[in-house]
Every structure is written in structure tokens, then in C-alpha cells.
């Protein structure tokens, strides 16, 4: 006796959309400044060149949300024309206003993509400025509005204007509301590889690819890494090593990137809760912890070096080291990283791939770090 499905037609597994990838380039400037727009266009051109080089998209459908001004955006699909060997834009939606910065707007955009291309796997790439875990409202003097010394251009500080900035919590909620979980979220933006962000996104993505430092304005080398991204089984180590190699051989040899397994964040938080219940860091020890930013006071500290500086006993120190290794799947940094904030470089002696703001006395940290999900999960009764 033979077995059949609910109908007599054979199920063609190759007909199933394996992966849907959304690339988001929200506005990174002001009403009068284009911010990183030209860099975003260049990144998209690199991706399209990689698609043409690979003669198609394999089993992935790629959608792009791009803001062309502060209040004008569009959503389109990238398709490969095998007759003309070109990448075409199939326009889906045009948007006016800044709803893309809100939970509701993000929910609609992600929902539209899901409706157009339901898939076995989803992934998200976000390009723009970044300040890390903190919210728009946390800043009384939004970083990019301050005058700075002449400096190399990076993707630092959130939007040039907080009107167009997006909270991590809004992104997480938008993804979860749509009933999906990303295979990975890649932030081509500064300061996004921190425990607070990774914990906030743990129910929205399996992996977080991000830098604990600033990223140069040109962003990631997409032609080099596209084949590692355009797959249901991304090669995170190769993405990171390609990024490192690309910048390490240039006149701006500043790059760091990490792949964080967000499914491990609950276990990491449990160990940190035990550490926090038993140990505190002295001012003298904190002064020696590896910093990852140019803020004054510092906002981001290397997680591994911070825990070492707590001087925990051997048992819990080993537990933490084992869990950190399970959480950070791959990470690499150049010998120095760059800070646009004060136009200087930071020597990297300790690099775990994740930062933490627990010990920070920066006004933004003091104002709201205790409100983060990470803090609440790692501190008893606070």
C-alpha cells in the first residue's frame, strides 16, 4: 500500500521560497542633509553587482526599503533578469512621512514583505547610524547634533536628527508582532553589538551581526560577503573575516564585527545575575577596563574584560567564559578602532565582541540603563 499526501500532486520543495531578506535604509540625515544616503546607494550597488556576478538570487527573495529624503521612502523587490543580465527594481509601495521610525510603521513594512514573500527563513540588514541600546528619548543633546573636530566619516550616533531615529525595542516588537523570527539581523551601523541590544532582540532573531565600535561610512564590503549572506545557512565567520581583511588593508584600518547567538542570551544573563549579586567593580579597576567608544564618560565597556575586572572566583569565571564563547560565535577586531566623536583611535587590547553599559556613568546610562530588559534580568529586585 502506497502513502500519498492530501492531494495526488507531488510536493516540489524547490518551489518553496527558502529565504526572504529585507534590506532597510531609513533616512540618516536631516531635512537639509542627506546623511549617509550616498553610502547607502553605494551599498545597494555593491549588492546588485554581487547578484549579477552570481547570475541570480538562488533561493532568496530580496526586498529593499529605502528613504530618498526625510519624508519619502519606497519598498521594492530586487529581481534578476537572466536575458539582460541586470538587476531590476520591482516597485511595491511608496511612503510619505516618517512612520518607518515607529513600531506601527515598521510592523507594516515587515508585514508587507512577509505577505509578498512568505518564506522558511527571514533575515534583515539595516544600514545607517547607530548609538546602541539607548532610546531616542534618552538623549537630551542628541550626539550627531553636536559640533565635532574634523574627522573621518563613520556611521556613528543614531540619525543626524532624532526625528528619524528608530528604537531597538520598536524593531523587536515589529518583528515579533508579525509572528516571525529572523535568522539574522545585520546592523551596518555603529555600537550595536552590546548585551542590552542582543537581549532586547533575543525573541526577534537567532543571530545578531554587529560592531561594538564605530563603522566607517562606507559600511560593509557587500560584494565580498554577499554569498555568505544570501543563504539560509549564513557563514558568519567568513562575513567577519572578509570585513576585517577588507578594512585592515586600507588607509582606514579600523573594523570590528561579531556574530552573537541571541538564543544564548538568557543563559548569559543568568550568569551575569549571579556575578552582580556577588561582585562589584572598584573605580580603580574600572579605569583599566577596555573601552569601546569615544564618549565622555565612556558608555560601552568590553564585556569579557569587565567581568575579568570584577575578580570573580575561578568557578564562576570559568562558567562565564564558557557561556561567552557559546554566545559570541565569531568576532574579530583590528588593532585600533576609530571614534568620530573625538576624531581619535582607540587601542584594542581586549576584545570579546560584546560590550556592556552596566558600569557606565554616562548621563544616558545613568538615566535609563536600569529600564532595559537586560538590567532587569541581571539585577535582583531592581
Predicted regions and their residues:
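Bacterial Sec-dependent N-terminal signal peptides
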Residues: 1-23
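Catalytic-core segments of thiol-dependent peptidases
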Residues: 67-70, 82-84, 98-177, 189-190, ...
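Loop/turn elements at helix/coil->beta-strand transitions in domains of secreted/extracellular proteins
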Residues: 18-20, 56-62, 117-123, 179-184, ...
Amino acid at each position: 500500500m502506497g502513502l500519498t499526501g492530501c492531494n495526488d500532486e507531488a510536493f516540489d520543495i524547490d518551489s518553496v521560497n527558502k529565504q526572504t531578506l529585507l534590506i532597510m535604509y531609513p533616512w540618516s540625515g536631516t531635512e537639509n542633509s542627506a546623511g549617509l544616503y550616498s553610502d547607502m546607494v553605494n551599498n545597494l550597488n555593491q549588492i546588485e553587482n554581487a547578484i549579477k556576478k552570481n547570475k541570480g538570487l538562488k533561493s532568496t527573495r530580496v526586498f529593499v526599503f529605502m528613504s530618498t529624503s526625510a519624508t519619502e521612502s519606497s519598498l521594492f523587490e530586487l529581481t534578476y533578469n537572466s536575458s539582460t543580465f541586470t538587476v531590476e527594481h520591482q516597485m511595491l509601495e511608496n511612503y510619505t512621512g516618517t512612520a518607518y521610525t515607529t513600531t506601527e510603521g515598521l510592523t507594516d513594512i515587515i508585514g508587507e514583505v512577509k505577505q509578498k514573500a512568505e518564506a522558511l527563513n527571514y533575515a534583515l540588514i539595516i544600514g545607517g547610524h547607530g548609538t546602541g541600546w539607548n532610546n531616542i528619548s534618552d538623549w537630551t543633546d542628541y550626539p550627531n547634533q553636536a559640533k565635532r573636530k574634523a574627522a573621518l566619516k563613520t556611521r556613528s550616533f543614531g540619525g543626524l536628527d532624532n526625528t528619524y531615529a528608530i528604537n531597538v525595542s520598536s524593531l523587536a516588537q515589529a518583528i515579533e508582532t508579525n509572528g516571525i523570527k529572523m535568522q539574522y539581523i545585520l546592523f551596518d551601523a555603529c555600537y550595536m553589538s552590546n548585551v542590552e541590544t542582543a537581549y532586547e532582540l533575543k525573541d526577534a532573531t537567532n543571530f545578531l551581526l554587529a560592531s561594538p565600535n564605530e563603522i566607517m561610512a562606507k559600511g560593509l564590503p557587500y560584494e565580498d560577503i554577499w554569498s555568505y549572506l544570501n543563504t539560509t545557512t549564513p557563514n558568519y565567520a567568513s562575513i567577519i573575516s572578509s570585513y576585517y581583511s577588507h578594512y585592515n588593508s586600507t588607509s582606514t584600518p579600523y573594523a570590528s564585527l561579531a556574530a552573537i547567538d541571541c538564543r544564548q542570551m538568557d543563559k548569559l544573563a543568568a550568569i551575569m545575575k549571579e556575578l552582580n549579586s556577588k561582585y562589584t567593580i572598584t573605580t580603580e579597576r574600572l579605569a583599566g577596563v577596555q573601552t569601546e567608544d569615544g564618549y565622555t564618560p565612556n558608555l560601552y565597556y568590553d564585556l569579557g574584560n569587565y567581568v575579568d575586572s570584577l575578580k570573580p572566583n575561578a568557578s564562576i569565571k570559568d562558567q562565564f567564559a564558557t557561556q561567552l564563547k557559546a554566545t559570541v560565535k565569531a568576532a574579530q577586531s583590528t588593532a585600533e578602532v576609530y571614534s568620530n566623536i573625538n576624531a581619535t583611535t582607540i587601542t584594542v587590547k581586549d576584545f570579546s565582541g560584546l560590550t556592556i553599559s552596566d558600569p557606565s556613568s554616562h548621563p544616558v546610562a545613568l538615566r535609563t540603563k536600569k529600564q532595559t530588559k537586560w538590567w532587569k534580568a541581571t539585577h535582583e529586585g531592581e
